[in-house]
Swiss-Prot record:
PANTHER family: S-ACYL FATTY ACID SYNTHASE THIOESTERASE, MEDIUM CHAIN, THIOESTERASE. In fatty acid biosynthesis chain termination and release of the free fatty acid product is achieved by hydrolysis of the thio ester by a thioesterase I, a component of the fatty acid synthetase complex. The chain length of the released fatty acid is usually C16. However, in the mammary glands of non-ruminant mammals, and in the uropygial gland of certain waterfowl there exists a second thioesterase which releases medium-chain length fatty acids (C8 to C2). Belongs to the thioesterase family. This is S-acyl fatty acid synthase thioesterase, medium chain. The keyword Glycosyltransferase does not apply. It comes from the Eukaryota. One of its GO terms (molecular function) is fatty acyl-[ACP] hydrolase activity. The active site is at residues 90, 226. The keyword Glycosyltransferase does not apply. It holds the Pfam family Thioesterase. One of its GO terms (biological process) is fatty acid biosynthetic process. InterPro entries: AB_hydrolase_fold (IPR029058), TEII (IPR012223), Thioesterase (IPR001031).
Length: 251
């Protein structure tokens, strides 16, 4: 489990698990600090995909099915023992959705809450822009990464780091487009769902996520760009909001 799931704090007496999914090209580093930031009733786990961090010598996943199966194998026992919630940012939202579908279809499990951050809903017209990423030149991709934020500027000045970042980003995009997004079922879930986005980002399309559940839904626009969650005040809001949602759920 340790290579797939980062979980510095075990918290055996916690009442609920929060599984966090990083963005495309990302790693565990941002969400690791959430492991300590949440109250003792919540134990945080962060997904670590192959091809990065301590798994940088492993081959990248071939498709979403491989990603979902690996995460399921690592987490299933834990998820069967305690209620769980999912938080994904950008690409991580899509991975968390695919995992949620798999868990419900194959194991009859459903999260108490799904939190989607900085991502287009799969039913939105903007989602299909993701399929055009392979056509974008590396120089333009680097400009986009710089504009979106989330990556220290000094990293983008390092040729070796940028080369690896671009490869991870492209590999994650390859995984994303292998999923049958045309078959996304409306009202498939009954849990509550919340979407978050940065107010400076255009064309969110996050309203399309609302269609996947019959539970209560909310959308929040927080100050900032795609990586609004890195702003300390926004991060504090997210932690408090997620905690409140979990505390108010049927756990």
């Amino acid at each position: 489990m340790d290579k797939v799931i980062a979980r510095p704090y075990k918290r055996p007496n916690a009442l609920c698990r929060l599984i966090c999914f990083p963005w495309a090209g990302g790693n565990c580093s941002f969400f690791i600090r959430w492991c300590e930031a949440f109250s003792s009733i919540i134990v945080v786990s962060v997904i670590r995909l192959a091809g990065r961090e301590c798994r940088d010598t492993e081959p990248f996943p071939e498709d979403m099915a491989e990603v979902v199966n690996e995460i399921t194998n690592a987490l299933l026992k834990d998820l069967q023992e305690k209620p769980f919630a999912l938080f994904g940012h950008s690409f991580g939202s899509f991975v968390s959705y695919a995992l949620a579908v798999h868990l419900k279809e194959k194991h009859g499990l459903e999260p108490v809450h799904m939190f989607f951050s900085g991502s287009y809903g799969p039913h939105s017209e903007y989602f299909h822009l993701m399929y055009k990423l392979p056509e974008v030149e590396d120089s333009r991709l680097l400009e986009l990464i710089h504009t979106l934020g989330g990556t220290p500027p000094e990293f983008l000045q390092n040729e070796q780091i940028t080369k690896h970042l671009l490869r991870v980003l492209k590999e994650d995009q390859k995984v994303l487009v292998t999923y049958p997004w045309h078959d996304v079922r409306k009202k498939y879930f009954s849990c509550d769902l919340t979407c978050f986005n940065g107010s400076d980002e255009k064309n969110h399309g996050s309203e399309a996520w609302i269609a996947i559940t019959s539970g209560d839904t909310s959308i929040y626009s927080l100050p900032g760009n795609h990586f609004y969650l890195m702003e300390p005040s926004n991060e504090t809001f997210l932690i408090k909001y997620i905690t409140k949602c979990i505390e108010n759920s049927d756990i």
